[in-house]
Amino acid sequence: MFASRPAVHPVEAPPPTDPVEQPTGVLMKDLPGMPGTAGGLGLRVAQFVFAGVALAVMASTSDFPSVTAFCYLVAATIMQCLWSFSLAIVDIYALLVKRCLRNRRAVCLFAIGDGITAALTFGAACSSAGITVLIDNDLNICAENHCGSFKTATALAFMSWFALTPSFLLNFWSMAAR
């Protein structure tokens, strides 16, 4: 009942005094994919290209306006194209003038914008995928519609979302770490 418990006294190791012995760490600003880096620019270009091609493929069909989900996909990809293109220009500017884009307000704006566009793009891609499956598998009226174009545009919208997700997560993580 009154058993003794051992006392635990952790012993701290002395910090290294020689700067050469200190472990090197990765600074948050060195992460690829952050705003103002070449990786961030690559992600923005990929987002823009995938969303732009999805928009072009969907808009090339004549019967997309008859389905609300496809109209939503077109609207979401337009917004995704505008957002990604504008941030790609900001990234190019930051790379050219070697400027840091890690201002708290800028990172907060990037994270909020990426979150909104990610939610819209993912919702549009999911709704378009549902309608495409309905048309192709359930109703079997793919011969009358442009199912190949619908599937391609939906897949490209998902790819745009996959390219957007790392940007959002890195910006959100950077914002939360401050």
From Swiss-Prot:
InterPro entries: CASP_dom (IPR006702), CASPL-5 (IPR045009). Residues 1-24 are annotated as: Disordered. It is a multi-pass membrane protein. Belongs to the Casparian strip membrane proteins (CASP) family. Keywords: Cell membrane, Membrane, Transmembrane, Transmembrane helix. This is CASP-like protein 5A1. The keyword Cell membrane applies. The chain crosses the membrane at residues 38-58, 70-90, 106-126, 153-173. Its main location: membrane. Residues 1-37, 91-105, 174-178 are cytoplasmic. One of its GO terms (cellular component) is plasma membrane. PANTHER family: CASP-LIKE PROTEIN 5A1, CASP-LIKE PROTEIN 5B3. Homodimer and heterodimers. Residues 59-69, 127-152 are extracellular. It is found in: Cell membrane.
